[in-house]
């Protein structure tokens, strides 16, 4: 038993130090990159023939908070208008968000290339020549498939409907993707750091009824922000969120063809190409990024995080239950895509990591003579060190949370919404902040347990799916939506 305890203590020491180092890298990168607005992009200032054309695809489902402001943010980009096409996508005209999309099209169609795509009017799926079985069950892919096929130019920017971006974002993402200015390294895939902002009015607040937004913004601005930045700084593995991603259509079309990509199984030759290749999967954002990461494109880097630009997601009236359900879904759809990272995730949370650190300091004989070690091997010492480590962790989270929510890196102007201003309106009293921090930390392990160990189904965009070990999904009939029959014959992508 002493050998076992010593082994656990040594493992805890190594693990906690690794986590502390990763956090340090993330904190350094956050403060280095988000302290001021990034420099103006290069690509918009090139000659007209040298400016790459960008097709922005925005999938929409339901009335998201501040939907109008989020959608028009891509129409207010400083990128040349004749080089920017915006495709708004919705499942049907019965969707409550449809009038908002129509309003955007009416207001901007005279000056911008903006189009509205309705899934039920997609000739690939409906009409005399269509068949709903031509695509898998993924509702997001089915939503944007037509817009992707109609894309102008080669660059695709998929950005969720509930994301707001500043005016220079398109240009800086193109710079990163294409390697501007000349001599810079181009990438296969670029993305942004996501950040949630709860815009629920104070008079509508209630812990269980609206506290989910506070928990979500706490997660995104602390644990997620630190590790997302660190992993993308080191670049040892793909780490993407899927809120705002840019890549080349030519790359994705070619790399989803087994005849041109040897890492794909030959049996996938009958699948459609491009974005449609991933319609059998619920975790399409990660799988697209993963495929581009693992596929050879000479002269290109794998993934590039566009440091300095934030993808802001306003949230409103989200219950604690909805936060838990969203986190469970997030973990379950990624369980089989990044299994190792999912299994070790509890160890990067404050409660577990600090306990491993405290156990290591109060258990292992770090000196030949135990009497020379200044920390006693007692329960009192263990809990004291744990509390001290938690306090330091919370202090760092408090600092980085307020730093990110100050929105210092955002180019502010008259068109910037209140949630992007970083002003007093969005600041939280310390009491409210610490309650949200404690709540998120306490919920982390139960959420992980429920997601990873206690189920394989997720509900997304009104449809219930079963997630399989080969990363494919099948929609479950009689669970809110009619099954389209796709999913049972899907093979592995990776």
Swiss-Prot record:
Q: Which Enzyme Commission numbers does its entry carry?
A: 2.4.1.80
User: Where would I look for the motif D2 in this sequence?
Assistant: 160
Q: Which Pfam families match?
A: Glyco_transf_21 (PF13506)
Transmembrane domains' residue ranges: 7-27, 338-358, 381-401, 429-449
Ranges facing Lumenal side? 1-6, 359-380, 450-494
Instruction: Select a single GO molecular function from the record's annotations and give it.
Output: ceramide glucosyltransferase activity
Source domain of life: Eukaryota
Task: Report the membrane topology from the UniProt record.
Answer: Multi-pass membrane protein
Q: Which ranges belong to the motif (Q/R)XXRW?
A: 326-330
Write down the Gene3D superfamilies for this protein, in alphabetical order. Spore Coat Polysaccharide Biosynthesis Protein SpsA, Chain A
An example Gene Ontology biological process: glucosylceramide biosynthetic process
A single GO CC term for this protein reads:
Golgi membrane
Keywords, in A-Z order: Glycosyltransferase, Golgi apparatus, Lipid metabolism, Membrane, Sphingolipid metabolism, Transferase, Transmembrane, Transmembrane helix
Active-site residues, Swiss-Prot/TrEMBL = 285 (proton acceptor)
Q: Where is this motif: D1?
A: 95
Report the pathway entry: Lipid metabolism; sphingolipid metabolism
The UniProt entry annotates the motif D3 at: 285
Q: Kindly report every residue range on the membrane side named Cytoplasmic.
A: 28-337, 402-428
Give the subcellular location: Golgi apparatus membrane
Q: Which family does it belong to?
A: Belongs to the glycosyltransferase 2 family.
> Domain note for this entry?
The D1, D2, D3, (Q/R)XXRW motif is a critical part of the GCS active site, involved in catalysis and UDP-sugar binding.
Protein function? Catalyzes the final step in the biosynthesis of the membrane lipid glucosylceramide (GluCer), the transfer of glucose to ceramide. Glucosylceramides play important roles in growth, differentiation and pathogenicity.
Question: What name is this protein filed under?
Answer: Ceramide glucosyltransferase
């Amino acid at each position: 038993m002493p050998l076992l305890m010593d082994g656990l203590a040594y493992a805890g020491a190594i693990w906690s130090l690794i986590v502390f180092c990763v956090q340090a890298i993330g904190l350094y990168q956050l403060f280095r990159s988000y302290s001021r607005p990034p420099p103006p992009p290069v690509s918009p200032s090139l000659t007209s023939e040298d400016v790459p054309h960008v097709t922005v695809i925005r999938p929409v489902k339901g009335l998201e908070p501040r939907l109008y402001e989020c959608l028009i943010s891509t129409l207010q980009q400083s990128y040349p208008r004749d080089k920017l096409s915006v495709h708004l996508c919705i499942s049907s005209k019965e969707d409550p968000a449809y009038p908002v999309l129509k309003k955007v099209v009416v207001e901007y169609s005279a000056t911008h290339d903006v189009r509205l795509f309705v899934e039920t009017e997609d000739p690939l799926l409906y009409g005399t020549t269509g068949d709903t079985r031509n695509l898998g069950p993924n509702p997001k892919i089915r939503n944007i498939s037509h817009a992707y096929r109609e894309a102008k130019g080669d660059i695709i920017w998929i950005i969720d409907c509930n994301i707001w971006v500043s005016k220079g974002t398109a240009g800086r993402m193109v710079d990163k993707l294409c390697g501007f200015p000349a001599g810079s390294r181009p990438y296969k895939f670029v993305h942004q750091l996501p950040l949630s902002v709860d815009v629920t009015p104070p008079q509508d607040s209630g812990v269980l009824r609206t506290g989910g937004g506070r928990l979500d913004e706490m997660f995104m601005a602390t644990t997620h922000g630190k590790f997302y930045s660190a992993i993308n700084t080191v670049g040892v593995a793909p780490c993407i969120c899927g809120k705002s991603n840019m890549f080349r259509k030519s790359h994705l079309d070619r790399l989803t063809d087994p005849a041109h990509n040897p890492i794909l199984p030959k049996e996938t030759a009958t699948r459609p190409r491009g974005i449609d290749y991933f319609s059998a999967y619920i975790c399409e954002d990660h799988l697209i990024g993963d495929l581009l990461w693992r596929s050879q494109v000479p002269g290109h880097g794998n993934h590039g995080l566009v440091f300095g630009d934030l993808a802001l997601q306003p949230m409103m009236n989200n219950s604690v239950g909805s936060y838990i359900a969203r986190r469970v879904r997030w973990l379950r759809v990624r369980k089989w895509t990044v299994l190792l990272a999912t299994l070790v995730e509890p160890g990067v949370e404050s409660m577990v990591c600090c306990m491993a650190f405290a156990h290591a300091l109060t258990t292992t004989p770090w000196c030949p003579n135990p009497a020379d070690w200044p920390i006693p091997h007692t329960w009192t010492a263990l809990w004291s060190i744990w509390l001290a480590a938690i306090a330091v962790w919370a202090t760092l989270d408090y600092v980085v949370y307020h730093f990110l929510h100050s929105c210092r890196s955002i180019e502010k102007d008259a068109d910037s919404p209140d949630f992007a201003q970083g002003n007093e309106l969005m600041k939280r009293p310390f009491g409210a902040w610490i309650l949200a921090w404690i709540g998120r930390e306490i919920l982390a392990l139960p959420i992980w347990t429920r997601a990873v160990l206690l189920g394989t189904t997720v509900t997304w965009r009104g449809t219930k799916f079963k997630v399989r070990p080969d990363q494919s999904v099948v929609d479950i009939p009689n669970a809110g939506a009619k099954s389209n029959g796709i999913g049972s014959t899907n093979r592995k992508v990776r």
